[in-house]
Regions:
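Active-site neighborhood of phospho(di)ester-bond hydrolases with catalytic His/Asp-centered motifs
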Residues: 25-27, 53-59, 85-92, 140, ...
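Short, glycine/acidic-enriched loop or turn micro-motifs at the edges of active sites
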Residues: 31, 62, 143, 181, ...
Length: 282
C-alpha cells in the first residue's frame, strides 16, 4: 500500500482453495493483561501454519474505547494479521466507553473494514463472506446495547439473514454469534433458570429454517459442545452448536451450572483455548 510516497512492506496473498480450508477460531480475547492472548494467538499460528484466516468471536478487548487495549490486541496478532485475514465479531465489551457506559462501538467500527450488508445504519455490525465451499454469517447480538441508539436492529438483521441465506449456493452454512443461544443457571443464584437466552429464542428458529450447519458462539468464557439441536431440543437434523471457550485471561471458574444440552464440557478450571476448523478437499 502506497500513501504520500510511503509504502508498507510487501505481503503475500493467496486465493481460497475450491475445496479445502483451515480457520482458527478464537473465543473472547478480552483481558486485563493481553500477554496470555498474545501467547495463545502466536502459538496457534505457529502450530497451524496452513491456516487461511482467523475468527475472533467478540469481546476482542475488555473496553471498546480504550485505545491502549486495541494496541495490545493488534500487537498480539502481529505477524498473523498481516498475512491472513481476520473475521471479527462485535461483542458487548466493544460497546463500552471508558466510564463503562454503553455507547456506539465507534472504535470497533473504525478498526475493521468489513463486507457491506446493505444497511447504512447498521454498517459493519453484521456481515457474511464465503471461503471455499463455506458461507459464514456473522451476527450482531448486541441488540440490548444498541437500543438507546438504534431501533429495529434485530428485525433488520433477521430480514437480511433470510435474504443472505437464500442467495448463497455454498454447501456449508456457518453462523458466528457472540452471545450464546443457551441460558445457564449460575452457581448460588437459583432465580436464574436453565433454558434459552433471548438471542437463542430470536435466532434458533431461523437457523432451523435456513438449514444452518454449525453455530459458533462465545460470551460465557467456557467451552461447551451441545451437539445438534432443533426446535429447542436435541435432534440430529439440527445445527451443531459450539460454545467456543475463552482466549483471554478473564475467566469465570465455577460460575456456570452445566446445561442439560451440554454434551462435552472443558476440564475445569478452564485455561485459554482456540478451535481449528477444517474442511478437507473432499
Amino acid at each position: 500500500m502506497i500513501c504520500s510516497e510511503q509504502g508498507t512492506p510487501w505481503y503475500a496473498l493467496h486465493t481460497p482453495d475450491a475445496g479445502a480450508f483451515q480457520a482458527l477460531i478464537f473465543p473472547d480475547s478480552q483481558s486485563n493483561d493481553y500477554t496470555d492472548w498474545k501467547h495463545l494467538a502466536q502459538d496457534a499460528a505457529a502450530r497451524n501454519e496452513g491456516a487461511d484466516f482467523f475468527i475472533n468471536m467478540g469481546d476482542l478487548v475488555d473496553n471498546g474505547e480504550d485505545h491502549r487495549q486495541w494496541d495490545a490486541w493488534f500487537d498480539a496478532v502481529a505477524g498473523i494479521i498481516d498475512r491472513i485475514p481476520v473475521a471479527p465479531l462485535m461483542g458487548n465489551h466493544e460497546t463500552y466507553n471508558e466510564d463503562w457506559k454503553v455507547r456506539e462501538p465507534v472504535a470497533y467500527l473504525h478498526e475493521f473494514t468489513l463486507p457491506a450488508n446493505g444497511s447504512e445504519e447498521f454498517a459493519g455490525r453484521y456481515y457474511s463472506f464465503d471461503y471455499g465451499p463455506a458461507h459464514f454469517i456473522v451476527l450482531d447480538t448486541q441488540t440490548d446495547e444498541a437500543a438507546d441508539f438504534h431501533q429495529g436492529l434485530l428485525e433488520a438483521q433477521q430480514a437480511w439473514f433470510r435474504e443472505d441465506v437464500r442467495k448463497t449456493d455454498k454447501k456449508w452454512k456457518i453462523v458466528l454469534m457472540h452471545k450464546d443461544p443457551l441460558q445457564y443457571r449460575i452457581a448460588n443464584r437459583p432465580e436464574r433458570q436453565e433454558g434459552f437466552s433471548d438471542e437463542g429464542r430470536a435466532w434458533m428458529p431461523l437457523f432451523d429454517e435456513a438449514g444452518i450447519d454449525v453455530v459458533f458462539s462465545a460470551h460465557l468464557h467456557t467451552y461447551r459442545n451441545r451437539g445438534h439441536i432443533k426446535n429447542f431440543e436435541r435432534d440430529a437434523s439440527g445445527p451443531l452448536y459450539i460454545l467456543t471457550g475463552v482466549a483471554g485471561n478473564v475467566r469465570y471458574p465455577g460460575l456456570w451450572v452445566d446445561h442439560a444440552l451440554d454434551k462435552t464440557v472443558a476440564p475445569q478450571p478452564e485455561t485459554d483455548n482456540y478451535l481449528t476448523l477444517f474442511k478437507d478437499a473432499g
